Every structure is written in C-alpha cells, then in structure tokens.
Amino acid sequence: AFKQGLFELQDAASQRVAPLLLGDWTPAQGSLKVADCCAGAGGKTLHLASLMGGKGKIVAMDIYQQKLDELSRRAKRNGAFNIETRPVEAKYLKRQRGSFDKVLIDAPCSGLGVLRRNPDTKWKLTPEFLDQIRSTQVQILEQYSQLVKDGGQLVYATCSVLPSENQQQVQR
C-alpha cells in the first residue's frame, strides 16, 4: 500500500503544521498559492497537497536538489500533481515577492524537540552550532517572509523546544 502511494509516514507533531497553515480554507473556496520554503523530501508538502485536494499550487523549495528529486518521486507516487519543486534561487524569490497566500517555513534547527528519536543529538550540540543555526533561521525568515502577499499568512515551525529558535525568532 505504501509503494502505491496510499499512505505516507509522518511524525504526529509534523501533522499539525499543514492544517495550521491552511486554517479554515477549504478546496471549495478556490485555489491557493502556497510556498513550502524548506521542503526537504516533502512530508509536510504532501500533507498540504492532500488537504488542498489537488486545488491550487504548492511551490516546494529547498537548497538540496536530491531532496527535491525525492519529493517529486513521492508526489508522483501519491498523485499530488499540484506540487512544483524548485531549488532556491534569488531571482525566483525576487520575482515572487508578495505573491503567495500561505508560506510555510519549517526551518532547520537544533532538533531538541525530537530527542526521543535522535537521543545522540544532545551530545553533539555546541554553543557555536546553536549560534550558527539561529543565524541561519534569521536569514531564512528574512528571505522567505517577503513571499507572503498582503493579508496572507506565514507559519514558522521547527522541531526545537528552545524559545531562541522559535518565539524569539519571529518576534524580531
């Protein structure tokens, strides 16, 4: 059933992000333009596509082409044809400024919220790494928040429990 695209595996907490982003929107309300800005292999992208019922367009972006290739493969297997994958390009981002109804940023983080799955993470963290990842998060927020149209919505998510990677980032 998995190989046929009948289901995808995803962490329970990850399942909360797509409904939060879509809010009260339903496919009957018309189409949406959604950006998934740190899409990776696309777990949340595929969930968004499922909830959107094939309506609208999802642009899934990442800096790693191999992850986007995996997302394309998974989307095809799942019959999610409203997903466009794009490597992050400054020219594209500039052209798309203010054009997305909804923007999801599932930012890279320390991973402190998923220690039960990756217990060795706590031994690998250094103050320097945390400073670097927070700096990356600031850059990502500054870059992708410009994609949201007036009246649109941005959801910023991490799998960290640190306020410095969550609330403090969006309050800047």
Predicted regions, residues:
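S-adenosylmethionine
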Residues: A1-R172
